[in-house]
Amino acid sequence: MYLSHLTMKNFRNYADVELDLSPGLTIFRGANAQGKSNLLEAIYLLALTKSARAHNERDVIRFEAAKQTPYTRIIGTALQKNNQQVEVRIDMAIAPRQDASTSGIYQKRIRVNGLPKPASQAVGAIAAVLFSADDLSLITGPPSYRRRYMDVLLSQVDKDYIKTLQRYLQVMAQRNQLLKRIREGKAGQD
């Protein structure tokens, strides 16, 4: 699989970009602060439906666009080994505020081949692996960093894995909550 086309509208520092990509190695080069990392972030967002860098996804909406119509659109078209195309489209917007005391409502819509999909079903439609300087913590950091990295990779490859992982995390949260209640004397051990 390779990404054959990328469209970005109001994403980070990009107002409107259309890129056609060829199979094989692609190198993006340029001066600092020109958007190379932003371009890679957009590709990663298409693969995993969430940003690798933004703590708040509202931050990916281009600042100038946020003043007018606060939205961003990223579309990626990938060509699979069997020559079938897959298109992932992610639209993010901030709805207008109801009054001056509230922030706008953030909305994210994901489509795969034109059909609306929840994030868990869109993960892996376009496969990507991002390795950055921050990922050195995979070597120096705790095992939880390595587990999370492997979870991200496996979620793209195996659709059932992400469902099982989500269920496992839910069960672990319930277990931890129950253990806390037992420790506090608010629940019995049976």
Language model feature labels by segment:
Residues 1-45, 65-66:
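Pre-Walker A-like glycine/lysine-rich segment at the N-terminus of P-loop NTPase domains
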Residues 23, 34, 38, 55, ...:
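Generic alpha-helix structural propensity
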Residues 30, 139-140:
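Ordered, soluble secondary-structure elements with a strong preference for glycine-centered loop motifs
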Residues 37, 138-139:
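Short active-site-adjacent helix-start/loop capping segments
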Residues 43, 47-50, 179:
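Short amphipathic alpha-helical segments enriched in hydrophobics
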